Amino acid sequence: MPKYLISYRKTEGGGQKPEWTSFTAQSETSLEAHAIRERVDRRMSVLGEQLWGTGEVVWVGNGRLDDVLYRREEAAPETSIVYGLVEE
């Protein structure tokens, strides 16, 4: 079953510097941007976090975990959510 790394920029209050947080999700079907956004929204509502940026969801491709994390750091500053397929 494919495993996705999903990362999003969050803040826990006004004036804070945004930081990346990540989690993995497994799905038998391929996940598209709207499904990724729904998962992030659910997680943030439970944790009391706020999404930072424009709300844009960006696919960063597939690769080893460290490759996907590296590509996350290359995302444009206004990008809110990035996700990629992690090879096992």
Positions of PLM-derived features:
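A short, exposed loop/beta-hairpin motif centered on an aromatic-Gly-Thr core
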Residues: 17-32
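Short amphipathic alpha-helices in soluble, non-transmembrane regions
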Residues: 36-40
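Coiled-coil-like amphipathic alpha-helices with heptad-repeat character
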Residues: 4-5, 32-34, 67
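Compositionally biased, low-complexity segments
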Residues: 3, 23, 75-76
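Residue-level signal for the start and early helices of compact helical domains
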Residues: 14, 35, 59-61
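Short, mixed-charge low-complexity intrinsically disordered segments
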Residues: 41-88
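Short aromatic-glycine-(Arg/Gly/Cys) micro-motifs in beta-strand/loop hairpins
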Residues: 1-20
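A periodicity- and composition-biased signal for non-globular, repetitive helical segments
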Residues: 9, 15, 32, 43-45
